[in-house]
Each structure stands twice: as C-alpha cells, then as structure tokens.
Amino acid sequence: MIQLVRPTEERKEQAVEFRQEFFDHGEFVINGSELFDKTEDYIEWCRSIDANTKEETVNPDWVITDTFFAVDDQDRIVGIIDLRHTLNDFLKDLGNCGYSVRPSERRKGIATEMLRQLLDVAKKAGMKELHLSVEKNNEPSVKTIIRNGGVYERSFDFDEEQADIYRIAVNSEIGYL
C-alpha cells in the first residue's frame, strides 16, 4: 500500500535518488514532478511547490498545484503526482494532473493507486472533474486512467505525437474502483 505525502526537506537524499533512477533509465522528463527533473536545488524546489499551493504565493504564470510523493510501506519514494486545481491556456491540453512511477516499481498498480488517492484530494478541494492527457502509445497510463473512471474526450497532437484527453468525474463513485 502507498500513501501520498508532500515533499519535505527531510526527504532530500531519497528524492534525489528517486530522480536519478529515471535519469539512469534514459528518462529525463518526470511527469507530475513540477519541474523536479529540471531542478538542481531540491530545497528551492520544495519551497517553490509549497508556494504554488496557495493563491497568495502561487507563481503568477502558474496555477494552484498540490504535489505529492507516493511512498510505500518502507517509506520509500515510489512515485510522484501533482494536481493542478485549474487549467490555464498552457495547461488546457496537459490536464489537471501528471504522474510518474520510478522505473523499478512499475507494473505493480502504483500509478492506479496514486491517481485513486489524488481523486480524494481533488474532491476535498471542491473539484468536480479532472482532465488528463496521455500519449496514445502509453498503454499503461491509459489503463490507469480508465481504471479510475476515465472517459475519452478528444485527441490532439503534442510534440509530434498523438495524445488523448480523458475526463474523470471526481464526485462519482466510478473514480474509486
């Protein structure tokens, strides 16, 4: 079982090791990480994502966003997920949430459980639905979204790839399979 926890300064060493595992596998984009994949200073990243949780301090070019690590029973970081409370023009095709599971922990249902738990966060935040984008060729993520009640809405081109937008009704029990 996993739980979602907010990144803290105390998790620095573990978080850097988590990020490095992606890089070691040739993956230099960590979806749902609020640019953790591009940030060298973990403490500054923690401050930035904390600021983005509040209307008074959110970056003016961004939206209120909650970012969580998923930790397992041994308190090891196994994934990351974010929840963007609204969509601006930039995010309209990217959706309300992104997520990644560390390469060594994939195909264990972690992404499905992270998204299920994030639906509870969205519900508490008063959100009625989430829009999620996924590249058509990312079958594991498509299955994760569908398992959590995702309904296909439309397709679009993204970085020369075909991608789809799915919608999940937050207030529906279908989101809690």
Segments and roles (model prediction):
Residues 89, 106-107, 137:
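Glycine-/small-residue-rich active-site loops that bind phosphorylated ligands and cofactors
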Residues 133-134, 146-165:
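Conserved catalytic-core motifs of GNAT/GCN5-like acyltransferases
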Residues 98, 102, 135, 171:
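Residue-level recognition of the GNAT/N-acetyltransferase active site
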Residues 123, 140, 162-164:
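Short secondary-structure boundary/hinge segments and terminal tails
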Residues 132-142:
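Conserved beta-strand-loop-alpha-helix junction that forms the acyl-donor binding cleft
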Residues 99-101, 107-120, 124, 143-147:
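Conserved acetyl-CoA-binding loop-helix of GNAT-fold acetyltransferases
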Residues 1-96, 159-177:
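GNAT-family acyltransferases
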Residues 122-133:
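Conserved GNAT acetyl-CoA-binding A-motif
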